[in-house]
C-alpha cells in the first residue's frame, strides 16, 4: 500500500514547475516583453512614434542625450520616470489593448511622442 505522501509527491513537482513558469522573473514572461529604444536630443524624441504589439508587456529604454534631465510621462499609461542628463532609463509598460498612447517630457512640454499598439 502506498503512503498518502507518495500520491501527492508528483503533484508537488507539477505545482513547483507551474509556479516557476509563471513567476515574474521567469524566461517565459521575459520573452513576451517587447523592447523599444527611444532617445531624447534637443528636446525631441527620436523616433517620435514607437510601435509595439498588443497584449504584450513593453520595455521602453529612454536614452537622454540632452544636457538637462527629462521626465518621461504618460497620463494614459500612468507612467512617470525621471531620466538624468546623459543617462538611460527603463520604463516598464503593462500589456496594452490596441490604440495610440501619448507620452511627453514633463520638464519640456513641447517634447511629445506616441506609442502605437497594434
Task: Describe the residue ranges of each PLM region.
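Extracellular/periplasmic metallocenter environments
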Residues: 29-37, 83-118
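Short beta-strand/loop motifs in extracellular/secreted proteins, especially
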Residues: 58, 68-70, 113
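Asparagine-centered strand-capping/turn motif at beta-strand->loop junctions
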Residues: 62-64
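C-terminal segment of classical bacterial N-terminal signal peptides
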Residues: 18-27
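N-terminal edge beta-strand
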Residues: 32-55
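Beta-strand-rich interaction surfaces with strong enrichment in secreted/lumenal proteins
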Residues: 48-50, 78-82
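Bacterial N-terminal signal peptides that target proteins for export
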Residues: 2-14
Amino acid at each position: 500500500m502506498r503512503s498518502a505522501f507518495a500520491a501527492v509527491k508528483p503533484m508537488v513537482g507539477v505545482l513547483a514547475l507551474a509556479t516557476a513558469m509563471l513567476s515574474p522573473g521567469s524566461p517565459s514572461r521575459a520573452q513576451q516583453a517587447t523592447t523599444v529604444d527611444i532617445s531624447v536630443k534637443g528636446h525631441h524624441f527620436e523616433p517620435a512614434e514607437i510601435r509595439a504589439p498588443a497584449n504584450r508587456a513593453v520595455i521602453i529604454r529612454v536614452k537622454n542625450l540632452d544636457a538637462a534631465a527629462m521626465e518621461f510621462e504618460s497620463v494614459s499609461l500612468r507612467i512617470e520616470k525621471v531620466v538624468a542628463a546623459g543617462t538611460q532609463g527603463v520604463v516598464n509598460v503593462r500589456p496594452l489593448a490596441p490604440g495610440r498612447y501619448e507620452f511627453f517630457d514633463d520638464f519640456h512640454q513641447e517634447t511629445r511622442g506616441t506609442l502605437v499598439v497594434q
